[in-house]
Regions:
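Receiver (REC) domain switch/active-site region of two-component response regulators
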Residues: 89
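Adenylate-forming
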Residues: 5-10, 14, 28-33, 40, ...
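A Lys/Arg-rich helix-loop hairpin that forms a DNA/phosphate-binding surface
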Residues: 373-381
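Structured interaction and signal-relay segments at domain junctions
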Residues: 17-24
């Protein structure tokens, strides 16, 4: 996929694969230490790399730059175009870089796993799968599940929604430490649900209070790596599923958690239907002011990424967001320090203090959820 480019034929996008592609690693050597001179230099390189305009017809759709300091510290900045990669792909890229680094240190050159398939095999499989009876049954599931869903579900806005959606955004983050993570995992185990289901339940409780609506539709990304061998491939496999929940005051937290468990399992079982096919089948009327079906996203990632290589340690640093595809995106990552929770939001719709207050209530529900699991939603303060 890193040798893949895109062009148009008869007005339609077509991918092609080059036998060889040129790649140059950008390099900056700094006479100083990272904690002093380094931060601005790294920030400047990040801004340069993140705003790089890819030519889709000139692979690789990857840009990288290494900043090295005289004391041996450094920063590797990588930008992968979204057409060729997803979060799982980034995990694979880091994993393979680790393997290659350690192999150079050890002198073992044959370390990368042999791939049993390529991305083109997946696209051929997907095109064939969409002609099957099984696919049609899965599509019918989604048509039934989302029939009559709200045309737009979102957090009430501070500013008027523009006639044409723009993607300007900002973000706000909180940390939940390991003690909180352990407590939530224990609670999930006792209730026989996943940590994701617990987090999503808390998020929907807060949304139901803020919106005063009882039909809540949230999008969540799924890895969608059901094709054999896709777990080892860099490429765009990610899909989105819509988790719809009926929420009413008489329900208990336990009731909602069980409903979300059932709906989530069904969504996972039907995750390989491309979201755009669902939108198309529902005949959703397009609106330039908002996205179809989903304007609130909830994402949970727990991919295991080690932070040690032979001879040194590293950490992954993500630049602050300045865009937002959705009105609201809650992105939670589990790591060795706990849960990193980021709320990415449309800055043209919401004030920062609105988002901070919303996230504060979300954190409060997470803190209390084991104690209030049998309480009716109407009684939650």
């Amino acid at each position: 996929i890193l040798r893949t480019g895109f062009t148009t034929t008869d007005g339609k996008p077509v991918q092609f694969i080059r036998e060889h592609v040129p790649f140059t690693l950008g390099y900056t050597e700094v006479a100083g230490r990272m904690e002093y001179e380094g931060k601005k230099i790294i920030d400047d390189r990040i801004e340069e790399i993140r705003h790089y305009r890819f030519d889709l017809s000139a692979p690789p759709l990857l840009k990288a730059h290494l900043v090295k300091f005289e004391n041996g510290e450094g920063a590797l900045i990588i930008n992968l175009h979204h057409l060729i990669a997803d979060a799982w792909s980034v995990y694979l890229l880091l994993k393979e870089l680790q393997l290659i680094h350690d192999s150079i240190v050890s002198g073992n050159n044959d370390v990368l796993p042999k791939l049993v398939s390529q991305y083109t095999d997946y696209t051929n499989w997907l095109n064939g799968m969409m002609q099957t009876v099984i696919f049609k049954k899965k599509l019918e599931y989604w048509k039934t599940q989302l029939a009559g869903a709200p045309a737009l579900f979102s957090l009430p806005t501070d500013f008027a929604r523009p006639a044409v959606k723009n993607f300007s955004g900002s973000s706000f983050s909180i940390w939940l430490g390991n003690d909180r993570l352990v407590s939530l995992k224990q609670f999930a185990k006792e209730r026989e649900v996943s940590l994701f289901m617990v987090l999503l339940t808390a998020f929907k409780i807060v949304l139901s209070r803020y919106t005063a609506q009882n039909d809540i539709v949230i999008g969540t990304p799924v890895a969608n790596r059901v094709f054999p061998g896709s777990q080892d491939l860099i490429g765009l496999f990610i899909n989105m599923v819509a988790i719809r929940s009926a929420v009413n005051d008489e329900m208990t937290v336990s009731d909602l958690l069980e409903k979300i468990k059932e709906t989530t399992i069904n969504a996972y079982n039907n995750q390989d239907v491309p979201f755009e096919k669902i939108v198309e089948s529902l005949g959703v009327k397009r609106d330039t002011s908002c996205l179809p079906i989903v304007e609130v996203l909830f994402s949970f990632q727990n991919l295991p990424v080690k932070n040690r290589l032979s001879g040194f340690e590293y950490e992954i640093i993500k630049p602050a967001s300045n865009s937002s595809k959705f009105d609201l995106s809650c992105i939670i990552e589990e790591n060795e320090n706990g849960l990193e929770c980021m709320l990415e939001y449309a800055s043209g719709l919401y004030k920062p203090r609105t988002i901070e207050r919303f996230f504060g209530h979300f954190e409060m529900i997470l803190n209390k959820i084991p104690q209030i699991v049998n309480d009716q939603l109407v009684k939650i303060d």
